[in-house]
Swiss-Prot record:
Top-level division of the source organism's lineage: Bacteria
Subunit structure: Homodimer which binds Holliday junction (HJ) DNA. The HJ becomes 2-fold symmetrical on binding to RuvC with unstacked arms; it has a different conformation from HJ DNA in complex with RuvA. In the full resolvosome a probable DNA-RuvA(4)-RuvB(12)-RuvC(2) complex forms which resolves the HJ.
Binding locations of Mg(2+) 2: E67
Function: The RuvA-RuvB-RuvC complex processes Holliday junction (HJ) DNA during genetic recombination and DNA repair. Endonuclease that resolves HJ intermediates. Cleaves cruciform DNA by making single-stranded nicks across the HJ at symmetrical positions within the homologous arms, yielding a 5'-phosphate and a 3'-hydroxyl group; requires a central core of homology in the junction. The consensus cleavage sequence is 5'-(A/T)TT(C/G)-3'. Cleavage occurs on the 3'-side of the TT dinucleotide at the point of strand exchange.
Protein name per Swiss-Prot or TrEMBL: Crossover junction endodeoxyribonuclease RuvC
Active-site residue numbers: D7, E67, D139
Binding note for cofactor: Binds 2 Mg(2+) ion per subunit.
Molecular function terms, GO-annotated: crossover junction DNA endonuclease activity; DNA binding; magnesium ion binding
Cellular component annotations (GO), alphabetically ordered: cytoplasm; Holliday junction resolvase complex
Cofactor(s) needed: Mg(2+)
Family membership noted in the UniProt record: Belongs to the RuvC family.
A Pfam family assignment: RuvC
Length: 154
């Protein structure tokens, strides 16, 4: 099964693609979709949707796993929620099933504790995907953790 993990954001959207068809998890790709901070949020949403469409066409995921947020008053909350909506809509247009996970569930699935530190989750990502080096940037590593959670929780 090919799974696309997504760490939503407005400035940077992390993505990670894993394949599980050979009995073990393998990283195929990871990175970020970076938007131009000099344009309005609507145009940034167009950039996110366009780049995500390219990823979907390239990797043809059978499942998407997206981080679900619970915000407590933040100036970027509305923009990130809007970006997340664009991501979910784009996946739906390509008929990619979506699973959503809050951060604590991702930490629990990978590190065994919903209160695990970021480095514990990163260690689990490296172990599960048999990586010698940590994926960079952090948003991409987070997206791989989300993809793995999708695999474990499917």
């Amino acid at each position: 099964m090919r799974i696309l993990g997504i760490d939503p954001g407005i400035a940077r959207v992390g993505y990670g693609v894993i394949d599980t068809s050979n009995g073990q998890q393998q990283m195929l790709d990871c990175g970020i979709i970076r938007t131009n901070p000099g344009i309005d949020d609507g145009e940034r949403m167009v950039e996110i949707a366009s780049d995500l469409r390219q990823l979907i066409r390239r990797w043809k995921p059978q499942l998407a796993a997206v981080e679900k947020f619970f915000f407590y008053r933040s100036s970027t909350t509305i923009s990130v929620v809007q970006a997340r909506g664009v991501i979910i809509m784009t996946l739906a247009r390509f008929r990619v099933p979506v699973m959503e996970f809050p951060p604590m569930q991702i930490k629990l699935a990978l590190a065994g504790s919903g209160h695990a530190e970021k480095d514990e989750v990163l260690d689990a990502v490296m172990r599960e995907l048999n990586l010698d080096q940590p994926p960079r940037p952090d948003d991409a590593a987070d997206a791989l953790a989300i993809a793995l959670t999708g695999w474990f929780q499917r």
